[in-house]
């Protein structure tokens, strides 16, 4: 009885408080006033609204209908870059308010927003055009690091050649990876063996403006968990679609998020595949191309293995498999001429100071007792191909691949037939030998080439290359323009007398697919020598909006792997943009104090992200 009286008394008091404050309560649960305070004329400011992007915020709509939104963020200091963008009405609805992107870290940002605020009431109620300025503090960059041999969270960008006016508002996504950390690479595949599950580095993804200031970064530990095989691995292959969202992969997953950090999807690979790395791309058909490997492959000797970086899968928007390219059945997985010439100290991100300068013999490559997995060797189940880019050619429904460990760029049709091979002719056999392109000069005359070397010309093949991309805007029938980052290790299918003779190049080729010829029309990097040399990773990509060539030598300074591991040298990647067809820099930026390994850079379009 006493408990009942207490309950009635509490209920009565609660009702009295509700009436006094003007609050009403909905049946089935409590409902009261909002507990946050609006700081402007709509709602509160919510920082990092999706947990993934700490330098973003949403100015909540406060219950109002908001349309006609534009946002600008004031530059920091005299050399800072102002950011300004419009937000479509549907994006305002997606985010429940005004999305704010590009805040400076550890800084009170001045953010001006302009919008139409619709008064409560039926459709057609009056609207008010409002402009107001918010002061929004964003916290410092905070990411997991290695702790030792590290002086900054992320590399510092130093502007060497200021951006030309046409490039002033450019934004560059940087994708780097850590050295192997103690909690990484602790598991391998088994039953069957092989694959590259242990390829597991902490990932660093951030965006800089043309003054080198950080304007966005990803809190990668929200997505990564090294203790979970389906949430570990390297974040790689970032691609921005026409809708402004980012597509990328991470070992056993591929995912799509918008620039605010909102998840579109985050999926495990289809069961026939494993070990995504390097490249993801959306086709004009709305499908996705992913560089993966086979989770169960039957070799000619009857053994079942997991393969390594030698399969391309195409999936639709719902994650259904559309097609696949199994390169061990299309190319020659036993071609070893380039494998024997590669410096084993730097095979993509597998950096081994003890193996620096060493090569492998044919006997080692073909050792029947050798294991399977992420090791240099011939045949399915070993790293014979190492495909690091996949580029769709809508002109004939084909794919163009950079097959690093073969020092070859290869075009393959939907029918799985090889159309052409851009590579030194050495080691190609049978029908594949007939697909190797013939080098010609600018006038179409055949060059004097013997094996892997061409005389009296600047023409060269590309060696352990990255990012073989068609330049759609320049190509026409009979002239397919192709850009390649020629890393330069194993140049001429050999190691030079001195490591310091090595160099890298950004190259543009023009291919006549009917005549089966190739000519070199532009290069940069040879003149920069060993200091600009990147034995692994890197990118060159044509930029249509500014008619320029973006080049990122992502691990410049890694030429001496032993000195790097001993802490005697530091990586200093270089980011450039050149006026098309020239070596005139429109922008040059050097990254210093780097304790990370550069992979790629990607120009980001802010307008499409909020359209």
Q: Across the structure, where does each feature detected by a protein language model lie?
A:
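Histidine-/acidic-rich catalytic cores in large beta-rich domains
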Residues: 28-75, 89, 93-97, 105-611
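Bacterial N-terminal signal peptides that target proteins for export
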Residues: 1-10
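Intrinsically disordered/low-complexity terminal segments and short unstructured peptides
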Residues: 11, 22-23, 122
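Bacterial N-terminal signal peptides
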Residues: 10-18
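Solvent-exposed beta-strand/loop surfaces of large extracellular or lumenal domains
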Residues: 81-89
């Amino acid at each position: 009885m006493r408990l009942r009286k207490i309950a009635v008394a509490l209920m009565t008091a609660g009702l009295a408080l509700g009436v006094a404050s003007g609050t009403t309560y909905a049946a089935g649960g409590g409902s009261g006033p909002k507990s946050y305070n609006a700081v402007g004329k709509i709602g509160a400011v919510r920082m990092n609204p999706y947990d993934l992007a700490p330098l973003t915020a949403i100015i909540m709509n406060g219950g109002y209908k908001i349309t006609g939104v534009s946002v600008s963020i004031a530059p920091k200091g005299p050399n800072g870059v102002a950011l300004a963008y419009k937000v479509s009405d549907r994006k305002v609805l997606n985010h429940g308010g005004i999305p704010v992107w590009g805040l400076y870290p550890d800084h009170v940002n001045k953010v001006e927003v302009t919008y139409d605020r619709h008064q409560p009431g039926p459709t057609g109620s009056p609207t008010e055009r409002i402009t107001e300025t918010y002061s929004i503090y964003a916290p410092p960059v905070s990411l997991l690091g290695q702790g030792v041999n590290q002086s900054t969270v992320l590399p510092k960008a130093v502007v060497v050649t200021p951006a030309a006016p046409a490039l002033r508002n450019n934004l560059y996504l940087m994708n780097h990876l850590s050295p192997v950390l103690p909690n990484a690479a602790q598991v391998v595949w088994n039953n069957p063996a092989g694959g590259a599950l242990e390829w597991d580095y902490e990932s660093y993804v951030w965006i800089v403006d043309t003054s080198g200031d950080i304007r966005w970064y990803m809190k990668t530990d929200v997505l990564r968990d090294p203790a979970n095989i389906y949430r570990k691995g390297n974040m790689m292959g970032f691609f921005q679609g026409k809708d402004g969202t980012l597509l990328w992969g991470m070992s056993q997953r591929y995912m799509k998020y918008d620039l605010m950090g909102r998840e579109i999807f985050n999926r495990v690979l289809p069961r026939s595949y494993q070990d995504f790395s390097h490249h993801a791309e959306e086709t004009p058909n709305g499908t996705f191309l992913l560089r993966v490997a086979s989770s169960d492959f039957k070799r000619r000797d009857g053994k079942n293995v997991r393969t390594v970086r030698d399969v391309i899968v195409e999936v639709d928007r719902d994650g259904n498999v559309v097609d696949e390219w199994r390169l061990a059945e299309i190319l020659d997985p036993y071609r070893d001429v380039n494998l024997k010439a590669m410096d084993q100290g730097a095979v993509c991100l597998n950096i081994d100071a003890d193996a620096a300068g060493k090569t492998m013999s044919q006997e080692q490559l073909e050792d029947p007792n050798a294991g399977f997995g992420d090791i240099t060797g011939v045949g399915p189940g070993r790293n014979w191909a190492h495909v690091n880019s996949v580029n769709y050619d809508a002109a004939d429904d084909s794919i163009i691949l950079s097959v690093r460990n073969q020092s070859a760029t290869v075009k393959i049709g939907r029918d799985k037939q090889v159309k052409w091979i851009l590579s030194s002719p050495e080691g190609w056999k049978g029908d594949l030998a007939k697909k190797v392109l013939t080098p010609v000069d600018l006038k179409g005359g055949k060059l004097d080439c013997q094996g892997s070397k061409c005389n009296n010309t600047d023409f060269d093949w590309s060696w352990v290359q990255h990012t073989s991309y068609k330049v759609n805007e320049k190509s026409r029938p009979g002239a397919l323009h192709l850009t390649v980052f020629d890393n330069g290790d194993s140049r001429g299918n050999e190691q030079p007398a001195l490591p310091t003779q090595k160099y890298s190049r950004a190259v543009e080729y023009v291919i006549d697919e009917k005549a089966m010829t190739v000519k070199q029309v532009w290069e940069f990097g040879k003149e920069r020598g060993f200091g600009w040399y990147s034995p692994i990773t890197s990118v060159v990509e044509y930029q249509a909006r500014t008619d320029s060539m973006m080049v990122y030598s992502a691990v410049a300074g890694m030429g001496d792997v032993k000195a790097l591991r001993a802490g005697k040298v530091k990586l200093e990647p270089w980011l450039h943009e050149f006026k098309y067809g020239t070596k005139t820099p429109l922008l040059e930026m050097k990254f210093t104090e780097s304790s990370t390994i550069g992979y790629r850079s990607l120009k980001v379009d802010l307008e499409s992200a909020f359209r």
